[in-house]
Regions:
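Short aromatic-glycine-(Arg/Gly/Cys) micro-motifs in beta-strand/loop hairpins
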Residues: 63-97, 172-176, 189, 203-222
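Hydrophobic alpha-helical segments that drive targeting, anchoring, or assembly
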Residues: 42-72, 84-105, 109-118
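Generic structural signal for short, flexible, solvent-exposed coil/loop and linker residues
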Residues: 3, 90-94, 135, 193
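N-terminal "first-domain core" detector
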Residues: 1-75
Length: 223
């Protein structure tokens, strides 16, 4: 990890995110929803790739032309971006889109882990209701405040999403009532996922494991 990234992301936070992600990628590989790789720093960005490393060994051009996907955490001065990179089988070019901005690396990590955990819950070998739908039905925790995005917030998104009118209408800032400095900036369709702001990693793990078969839970030992 380069020095600039180390200044922005404390090592203990890196270790915590990697530890919980390792738990969930192990579950993904167990249920056949993987393979998911270990987190990997590349040019100051943390990649959480799926269907990548083994095929890269078999075909060196897989990085450029393969159909792998990845969540990417990018530390920027003052905030943390989470993007999704994907190349569909029939598309010529890979797409990458910024999805959420957080004030905290840990919250960015929880977002990525929630996405992986929900993909496991809804995969064909598990078939549970997604946490997203559960949270959507219940509504956000009262400890999370929802506000219209500021001009500065909108500026972050239109730099990469290039749709100011849409952002002005749909972009929101979600912050903890008791800790306004802990926030996420996202389009309103992401609102249920902003519940992660109010959860610890252990609480998120318990929510994702809820209802899973014993064949999975018996192999899980969160530390």
């Amino acid at each position: 990890v380069d020095m600039e990234v180390e200044r922005q992301v404390p090592r203990d936070e890196l270790v915590e995110v990697a530890r919980y992600y390792d738990l969930w990628r192990g579950i993904a590989n167990l249920v056949g929803d993987g393979p998911d790789d270990e987190p990997d720093w590349d040019a100051g960005r943390l990649f959480f790739r799926s269907d990548y490393s083994q095929k890269l060994k078999e075909w060196p051009k897989w990085a450029e032309f393969g159909d792998w996907g990845a969540w990417i955490i990018t530390p920027e001065p003052g905030y943390i971006c989470v993007s999704h990179s994907l190349k569909h089988e029939r598309e010529v070019f890979r797409t990458e889109r910024m999805e959420v901005v957080f004030s905290s690396f840990l919250d960015a990590g929880k977002y990525v882990i929630m996405q992986l955990g929900d993909s496991i819950r809804t995969c064909s070998n598990v078939r549970l209701k997604s946490l997203f739908l559960n949270w959507e039905a219940r509504g956000l925790s009262p400890g999370i405040k929802v506000q219209a995005a500021s001009e500065k917030d909108i500026g972050l998104f239109i730099d990469v999403r290039d749709d100011k009118e849409y952002a002005e209408k749909h972009l929101k800032r979600y912050s903890l009532v008791d800790s306004p400095g802990s926030y996420g900036i996202a389009l309103d369709y992401e609102q249920p996922r902003m519940e992660i702001l109010a959860l610890s990693f252990d609480e998120l793990t318990a929510a994702l494991l809820d209802g899973m078969p014993e064949t999975i839970t018996s192999k899980v030992h969160p530390r």
